[in-house]
């Protein structure tokens, strides 16, 4: 039944912050979404998620939760399981899809089984990566269960030896063949792939390029041949469905133009994409005619348990 605002879930708790390496990104997303939801007519409570989250939610008693958490605990199925246990409808993907997408190796297995184009990769420890080339260069080394390009190393084709890693790298690292070309991304909203964005940078699309002002330029819609645009949209939608995602997701791809459609590679699918007004997914929604408050409101009205 709709509340006084005409909304199914008039009182919303926005989860943000948390304890992962992506805390600052999450706070930015959370504050932006809170403001947008207030503009859309919701009563919003901001919640900096911590170990006392169950108690806080019991006190707040929201009709639904908007999950603006990023990284471990927030997008790996943990908080999703808590919300289902508490029977609070929530946004974005459920337990299984969130856990699969956060584990890059498991997600790749799902993608490959679905016939989606992925690149060669292996899982290795930091000691193994530093002892010798795990794959022929060029290749990329990154944590298997992190986002926002945290802890990413690129080993060039002419590298003299393996990379020297930071001492705090996690135990499980994904090492994958480096794919040259353009960085493309597609947001899926429900059962619709919105658009293709071409991410233009001076180098690797790392944490600074993603979040530093002027670090990258987003071209939406991407200037691509029609067949490549269609293929990107199709791959993102199939990836969303293969993982069992709900709400929105964003799939990142690389395109080696010299190989035509065969040069498209799916890198990963993010179940909790960045959510500031200038983030990639809201930009694509705006291209499709949805304001940021409308985009956030759609996610809240899509909320449910057992996702």
From Swiss-Prot:
Lineage top rank: taxon: Bacteria
InterPro entries in UniProt: ATP-grasp, ATP_grasp_subdomain_1, D-Ala_lig_Van_CS, D_ala_D_ala, Dala_Dala_lig_C, Dala_Dala_lig_N, PreATP-grasp_dom_sf
Free-text cofactor note: Binds 2 magnesium or manganese ions per subunit.
GO cellular component: cytoplasm
Binding annotation for Mg(2+) 1: 252, 268
Compartments it resides in: Cytoplasm
Catalytic activity: 2 D-alanine + ATP = D-alanyl-D-alanine + ADP + phosphate + H(+)
One GO BP annotation of this record: peptidoglycan biosynthetic process
Alphabetic keyword roster: ATP-binding, Cell shape, Cell wall biogenesis/degradation, Cytoplasm, Ligase, Magnesium, Manganese, Metal-binding, Nucleotide-binding, Peptidoglycan synthesis
Pfam families, per database record: Dala_Dala_lig_C, Dala_Dala_lig_N
GO molecular function: ATP binding; D-alanine-D-alanine ligase activity; metal ion binding
Top-level EC class: ligase
Binding positions for Mg(2+) 2 per the UniProt entry: 268, 270
Keyword Cytoplasm found: yes
Necessary cofactors: Mg(2+); Mn(2+)
Free-text function comment from the UniProt entry: Cell wall formation.
HAMAP family in UniProt: Dala_Dala_lig (MF_00047)
Designated name of the protein: D-alanine--D-alanine ligase
Gene label: ddl
């Amino acid at each position: 039944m709709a509340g006084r605002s005409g909304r199914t879930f008039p009182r919303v708790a926005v989860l943000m912050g948390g304890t992962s390496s992506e805390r600052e990104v999450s706070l930015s997303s959370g504050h932006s979404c809170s403001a947008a939801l207030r503009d859309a007519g919701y009563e919003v409570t901001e919640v900096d998620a911590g170990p006392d989250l169950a108690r806080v939610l019991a006190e707040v008693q929201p009709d639904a939760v908007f999950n603006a958490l990023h990284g471990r605990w927030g997008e790996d199925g943990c908080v999703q399981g808590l919300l289902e246990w508490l029977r609070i409808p929530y946004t974005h993907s459920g337990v299984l899809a969130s856990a699969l997408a956060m584990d890059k190796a498991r997600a790749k297995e799902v993608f490959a089984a679905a016939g989606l184009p992925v690149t060669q990769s292996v899982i290795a420890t930091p000691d193994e990566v530093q002892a010798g080339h795990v794959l022929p260069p060029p290749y990329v080394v990154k944590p298997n269960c992190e986002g926002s390009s945290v802890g990413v190393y690129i080993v060039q084709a002419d590298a003299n030896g393996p990379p020297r890693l930071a001492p705090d790298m996690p135990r499980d690292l994904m090492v994958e063949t480096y794919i040259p070309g353009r960085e493309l991304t597609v947001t899926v909203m429900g059962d619709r792939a919105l658009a293709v964005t071409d991410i233009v940078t001076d180098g690797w699309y790392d944490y600074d390029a993603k979040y530093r002002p002027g670090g990258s330029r987003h071209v939406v819609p991407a200037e691509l041949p029609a067949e490549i645009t269609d293929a990107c949209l199709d791959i993102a939608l199939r990836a969303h469905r293969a993982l069992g995602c709900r709400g929105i997701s964003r799939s990142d791809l690389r395109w080696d133009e010299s190989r035509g459609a065969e040069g498209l590679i799916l890198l990963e699918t993010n179940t909790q994409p960045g959510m500031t007004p200038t983030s990639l997914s809201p930009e694509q929604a705006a291209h499709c005619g949805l304001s940021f408050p409308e985009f956030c409101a759609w996610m809240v009205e899509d909320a449910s348990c057992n996702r």
